[in-house]
Amino acid sequence: MTAPAADDRIDEIERAITKSRRYQTVAPATVRRLARAALVAARGDVPDAVKRTKRGLHEIYGAFLPPSPPNYAALLRHLDSAVDAGDDEAVRAALLRAMSVHISTRERLPHLDEFYRELFRHLPRPNTLRDLACGLNPLAAPWMGLPAETVYIASDIDARLVGFVDEALTRLNVPHRTNVADLLEDRLDEPADVTLLLKTLPCLETQQRGSGWEVIDIVNSPNIVVTFPTKSLGQRSKGMFQNYSQSFESQARERSCRIQRLEIGNELIYVIQK
């Protein structure tokens, strides 16, 4: 019997992933890229490649969310109640509750006011702000002090999460656009005054070595914010600050980029001017 073609086996892996409640709304481009690499590593063994693909999705996406998909409908109801009541404090409380669902944003919550106050001291007031691999970070818009006319452009690999972000920003009356996008597969040449890449580069490098700076080079934005975690998800430092700072600053020098470095909470921050 002739072995199935690689594309057929990748289709089979993709079908298996879409049956998983945890990963069924991840961008097909992401699933297929990981499936392709997994199939090679598994030497064509589809069941093994499915396991490897899920492992890859966990590393770049699943590890940051609860084991079951968040109840976005309930989170929106809480936000709706606060907005309808006209209670700004209740709105912020609902947003904090929602952001705590995602580990990456949850880690930032104790320092949220300081984070955006200090960050935007080093940035121009943007007409357009793009948030790549955004997670639930767009829900922090009320803390950013953006002009009312600023358009917030948010993208992520998870269609379910992106839909929630779109609904939340609509309720907050934030001008915005959202889309499902994979930074290693989709075009990144839409212009924006400021682009955020918060805790994103380590996930890119996990998938493709050298891809972090490739994305920075391609992004059509004069001001780019890149951040790194200085502790692991288990809250261990593992020399992360030194490793990330040395590597990133070396690459920045090679490109003659102007950078400013900040550290707030467990986050190493670079403001890049291209």
UniProtKB/Swiss-Prot annotation:
Its EC number is 2.1.1.179. InterPro entries: rRNA_MeTrfase, rRNA_MeTrfase_GmN_bac, SAM-dependent_MTases_sf. It is an enzyme of class 2 (transferase). Induction: Regulates its expression by binding to its own mRNA. GO terms for biological process: response to antibiotic. It comes from the Bacteria. Changing D182A: Loss of S-adenosyl-L-methionine binding. S-adenosyl-L-methionine binds at H102, I103, S104, T105, R106, E107, R108, A133, D156, D182, L183, L198, Q207. It catalyses: guanosine(1405) in 16S rRNA + S-adenosyl-L-methionine = N(7)-methylguanosine(1405) in 16S rRNA + S-adenosyl-L-homocysteine. It holds the Pfam family FmrO. Signal peptide: none annotated. One of its GO terms (molecular function) is rRNA methyltransferase activity. The keyword RNA-binding does not apply. Belongs to the methyltransferase superfamily. Aminoglycoside resistance family. This is 16S rRNA (guanine(1405)-N(7))-methyltransferase.
